[in-house]
Amino acid sequence: MTLVHGEVDHEEIERREAGRQEVGHGKAGSGRRWATLTGCKEVLVVVHSTVYGQRLHDIYSLLGADLRVHVQFTVAPHAFNAGAAAHVRSVGGTVLPWEEAARREFDLVLAAGSQGLEQLRGPLVRLPHGAGHIKLSPAGSGIGAGGGGGTGGTRTVSGLGPEYLVRNGRVMPAAFALAHEEERAEVGRGCPEALPITEVVGDGCYDRIAAALPARERYRAALGLRPGERLVLVCSTWGSGSLFTRLDAVLPRLAGELPRRGYRTALLVHPNVAAAHSPWAVRSWATATARGAVTVLGPEEDWRPLLVAADFVIGDHGSVTLYGTMTGAPILLAEYPHRDVNPRSPGALLARTAPALSPAHPLTSQLDYAARHYRRSEYAAIAARISSEPGRFDRRMRRLLYRVLGLGEPAHVPEPPVLPLPAPLWPRNGATGRSGQGRQ
């Protein structure tokens, strides 16, 4: 070993160490050349969109503390992948170029979408990207309930049909993690060849919301809500049947009819809308329509604390509205495209239970009506159909991941699911979030 002025030449040590980590070391190839930890199991998290990345966060976090596992990220081709790379960077990840990811081999591939996955090498674990598998596949997709061709076939449940799970006659995932036994039954109807690889693990969002509800007042205080203030959460999914298409009818009513004192209103828009039209466009449309009286959340916001804190939910057929059935907040449906909804889903049951927002009656009287006629047991029955493994997602999901990796699990139970307290939307120092310009 070379000495420099009687000391170890650390540069030479680094050169020798780098020489032992040449191109091709391990499965992952050249990306590991300069790694400090070598011999790790290589995990690729495939982020198709901001929503998919948010959904996967609770899953890959189960691996984050294990020095035997190296988690990497890539952004897949997708119509809504604008913002996906920024999401990866926001959690401290580095984006592996898609072309490089397709050349390498991984010990585990994690994804909540389906596009492009046939290009990747490694056992694939697929997950849903929302709750309840509410939506049907697009009309005219040519995929029938049995996976046959033609344009007149029965529409499959979005995410559960062969168009999402089968490529070139082969079931792609090594495992398909589902939230509820009902979804497994849907796979049996729509894509029976994938039934053997399904596994019911529960729903991570469900567990985190459920764990946060007893501390609801802490979340309300963190957001800046004062005692007695009512929070109306307006949430929209994406697409032509969403609440967003009626924004010019809904938001002016919130701005004009709700008293400024005693109410706060927040708008949560599915990140796919911002990905398609730009965050600036969404913010501009919403703030102009609401005349500054509604706080607009950006696509990277964690919506779960808002849902926990909400006193009322005005929504549509999106996942957030369905999760609202857990909270005890009365729900009004402003839009619901019944023809595009899986009739066996909990979302369809919600549409038959929750009152519909009417343009012909005062908004405050409709909120009062929703509160008076709210029956907690009815909505609890809907919420129970989101997850058939309540409180057990982290344990069951971790067991599945380590089984695919071929590793023993860490010798401790996963940390209990915790929903972080949010930064204030409505600071109590005299500033106001009602202009729609704060934290967007």
Give the ranges of each region predicted by the language model.
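Catalytic binding pocket for nucleotide-activated donors in carbohydrate/polymer assembly enzymes
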Residues: 319-385
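A donor-sugar binding/catalytic signature common to diverse glycosyltransferases
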Residues: 115, 122-126, 298-343
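Extended catalytic core of nucleotide-activated donor transferases of GT-like folds
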Residues: 80-165
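A nucleotide-sugar donor-handling region in carbohydrate enzymes
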Residues: 2-5, 132, 137-140, 148-151, ...
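C-terminal amphipathic helix plus adjacent low-complexity
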Residues: 2-5, 361-440
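Conserved catalytic-core segment of nucleotide-activated headgroup transferases in glycan assembly
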Residues: 52-65, 198, 204-284, 388-399, ...
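Donor nucleotide-activated moiety binding/catalytic core segment of transferases
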Residues: 96-100, 279-314, 318-319
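N-terminal pre-catalytic "stem/leader" segment of glycosyltransferase-like enzymes
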Residues: 1-97, 416-417, 428-440
